[in-house]
Each structure stands twice: as structure tokens, then as C-alpha cells.
């Protein structure tokens, strides 16, 4: 089984994905980390050097390289489902799970990792909250195309595992 975790940055896709993969005895791929390994530079550097449009094209290329891998849990970038036909492709090749979180719950998580997230670099307080509300509203239509939607509040890998196996 291939499972694609989608959702806003900071929703727990990577943290839960690693644990879920372990529980399922699957491999784990963090798409952003995979891109960084393949490109030899950070996401932040790619954004700074080449811009978001270039990054989204790279993201699509690398997603398609791994999309038909079996027995893997893939943590996607927050914007991955929103570009090209990425969401449709993930839906075709595996189980997609949207980890849904309210913007106010995302803020503390994002503030802890802001330096690694180029889209929110330098944002704080109301500016960050407004940005999260706005972009989450824009992305939710894509996220809700997932096969399953689960709330990320107090979500454990065990609960996510059980949820993925439910019909």
C-alpha cells in the first residue's frame, strides 16, 4: 500500500508519516527531504535561487519518480497537491490522507520551524496568522480531494494507522 499524507505545513505529516511507516513496516519518504537530497541544496536555497515556480516543477518531477513505489508512506510538501495534476496522480497511485488542522493550531508549530519554511520566512504574529488563513483557504479544495480526511489534533501514529486501514 502507498499512502500519501497531505496537508498544510506544520500539520504533522512528516512526524506522523515516519511513525506510520514504521508501524506498517513500509519505507518512508519525505518529499521535501528527497528533493533536497537529489538537488544537493535546501528548499530555502531552491526558492531563493530559482523561485517558487521552479521549485513546484522540481516537486512534480520528484513526485513522479516515486509515485508508483509500493509499501511506502510519503509526506508531501504543503503545496504539493495544489500544483499541476499532483493530487489526481496521488489519488490514482495510492491512498491520500489529508491531515486537517485549524490555522491557530498550526501557528505555534510553524513558529518553531520558520527558518526551514521559505514561504513564511520572517513572518510572525498577525501577519503569519493572516497568511496561514489565506493560503489554507486557497489550498483546502485540493486537500479535500484526498480519499480520507482526519483531524490532526492529538492524532497519534496508532490512530492514523487504524484510520488508514478503515473502509
Feature-to-residue mapping (PLM):
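Hydrophobic anchor at the beta1->P-loop junction of P-loop NTPases
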Residues: 5
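ATP-binding Walker
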Residues: 11
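ATP-dependent small-molecule kinase phosphotransfer cores
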Residues: 33-80, 84-91, 116
Amino acid at each position: 500500500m502507498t499512502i500519501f499524507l497531505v496537508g498544510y505545513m506544520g500539520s504533522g505529516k512528516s512526524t506522523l508519516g515516519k511513525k506510520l511507516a514504521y508501524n506498517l513496516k513500509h519505507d518512508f519518504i519525505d518529499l521535501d527531504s528527497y528533493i533536497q537530497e537529489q538537488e544537493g541544496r535546501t528548499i530555502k536555497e531552491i526558492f531563493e535561487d530559482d523561485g517558487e515556480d521552479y521549485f513546484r516543477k522540481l516537486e512534480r518531477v520528484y513526485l513522479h519518480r516515486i509515485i508508483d513505489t509500493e509499501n511506502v508512506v510519503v509526506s508531501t510538501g504543503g503545496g504539493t497537491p495544489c500544483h499541476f495534476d499532483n493530487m489526481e496522480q496521488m489519488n490514482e497511485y495510492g491512498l491520500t490522507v489529508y491531515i486537517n488542522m485549524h490555522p491557530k493550531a498550526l501557528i505555534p508549530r510553524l513558529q518553531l520551524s520558520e527558518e526551514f519554511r521559505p514561504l513564511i520566512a520572517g513572518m510572525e504574529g498577525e501577519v503569519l496568522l493572516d497568511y496561514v488563513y489565506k493560503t489554507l483557504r486557497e489550498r483546502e479544495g485540493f486537500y479535500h480531494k484526498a480519499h480520507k480526511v482526519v483531524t490532526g489534533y492529538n492524532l497519534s501514529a496508532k490512530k492514523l494507522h487504524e484510520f488508514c486501514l478503515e473502509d
